[in-house]
């Protein structure tokens, strides 16, 4: 029997069931017919955060950042590139801590950027401070999976 994973659509936020062996074949959402993986980080607000973290069975790496943060801006291209390298095994997302202050407080974000890796809805790893390259991000994620 084939294992089916729950994957939340980055466009309409519908939860989809996808056979694990079909992850690499660019599956589309059953509702909106858009790609389930875009190769780019998702911008999450509080509602979409709950849906993606709580319902997705694919690990989610979240970058808690702020627009005024120099190290956040420095790491942004590496994080973008890492999304293309890690999907579909890991979804990458960003939370603007200026816009989502309650979410940042809930996760006790004290310095930015902070990366948090969630697996099956639970935080399994955290890194405060910027990574210099996409390869550093990928290596850190893989070391925690």
Regions found by a protein language model. Give the residues of each.
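Short cysteine-rich clusters marking metal-coordination/redox-active sites
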Residues: 9-12, 29-32
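Cys/His-rich microdomains that often coordinate metals
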Residues: 13-16, 36, 76
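Short linker/helix segments within small regulatory modules
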Residues: 18-27
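Short Cys/His-rich micro-motifs in 6-15 aa windows
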Residues: 32-41
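Thiol-based oxidoreductase modules, predominantly thioredoxin-like and allied folds used
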Residues: 44, 64, 76-83, 87-102, ...
